[in-house]
Regions:
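N-terminal glycine-rich FAD/FM-binding segment characteristic of electron-transfer flavoproteins
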Residues: 1-317
Length: 317
């Protein structure tokens, strides 16, 4: 049977992680269908149809799908589920909210946060904050799976021409009401998809000292991250948190400043292509995953680093 991928979008365009999820889903079965639920989401459906790995797009539109509530989405998914052996979406906030509800309604066990597809019924997922990996075999006839997007390359975004079909919308779930959405507006790259991330930890000592991180991030056109310790201390807002309970990032360059390297933080960044650590404690666990380490006082090292960047007189693009 086919694989149903629940596409994430903003009613106008696909979210970037959907491309990673498509790659993963196509490794389960090449007969891959994308489900686009929303309101006036024709552009997103068209974008999904242009993905070469997608064989068919199913779109469901109604005003009560505007804000992507799992309570409204899940009946649509379960109604279509009979035609599919696997139901897949990203293991981000969207997927973690939706998929448990879908799995419960289908009376099946969810396989969460997979990083590798071994076969149609066997998958690899991290456990113990990424310090070990479990190979999981699902014997359920219908499998509900969430995928860690950063573990898979994004698929090609053009060249396909999948047909678009329309399915009937369900009734609105009235016990849950959308109140509002507050989005953080920034000129910086989005943390989850940035090529360069500069993160600060408890060693920054205060929120004001994060201005050092900001100055360097400005020169590198980088996203700003933080450890949970820095967030809990109130140095920076939690939308910057990297780690097991924050965002998982896989940038080309990750600069960790004043971060000791608790396993929860390492779980969110240790797959970065190049890791640079700056910490005055030479025994800090962060050095165990770093490609380059500088044992130094960050309040001396960062101004020197910024001075050298200023000499280049350029901002990375």
């Amino acid at each position: 049977m086919s694989v149903l991928l629940i596409a994430e979008h903003n009613n106008k365009e696909l979210k970037s992680f959907t491309l990673n999820a498509v790659t993963a889903a196509s490794q389960i079965d090449t007969d891959l269908h994308a489900l686009v639920i929303g309101n006036n989401c024709g552009d997103a459906a068209k974008a999904a149809s242009e993905l070469p790995l997608v064989k068919k797009v199913i779109t469901v539109e109604a005003a009560h799908y505007e804000n992507f509530l799992a309570e409204n989405f899940s009946p649509v998914v379960t109604k279509l589920a009979d035609n599919y052996s696997h139901i897949v979406c990203s293991a981000n906030t969207f997927g973690k909210n939706l998929m448990p509800r879908v799995a419960a309604k289908l009376d099946t066990s969810q396989v969460s946060d997979i990083i590798k597809v071994e076969s149609t019924d066997t998958f690899v997922r991290p456990i113990y904050a990424g310090n070990a990996f479990a190979t999981v075999k699902s014997t359920d006839a219908k499998k509900c799976i969430t995928i860690r997007p950063t573990s898979f390359e994004p698929c090609e975004s053009s060249g396909g021409s999948a047909p678009i079909e329309t399915a009937e919308a369900g009734e609105e779930f009235l016990l849950t009401k959308f109140v509002k959405r507050e989005e953080v507006k920034s000129d910086r790259p989005e943390l989850g998809t940035a090529r360069i991330v500069v993160s600060g930890g408890r060693g920054m000592q205060s929120g004001d000292n994060f201005k050092l991180i900001t100055s360097i991030a400005d020169k590198l056109n980088a996203a700003i991250g933080a450890s949970r310790a820095a967030v809990d201390a109130g140095y920076i807002s939690n939308d910057h948190q990297v780690g097991q309970t924050g965002k998982v990032v896989v940038p080309d360059l990750y600069i960790a400043v004043g971060i000791s390297g608790a396993i929860q933080h390492l779980a969110g960044m240790k797959e970065s292509k190049v890791i640079v650590a700056i910490n005055k404690d030479g025994e800090a666990p962060i050095f165990s995953v770093a490609d380059y380490g500088l044992e130094a006082d960050l309040f001396e090292a960062l101004p020197q680093f910024l001075e050298e960047l200023n000499k280049l007189n350029t901002i990375q693009k």
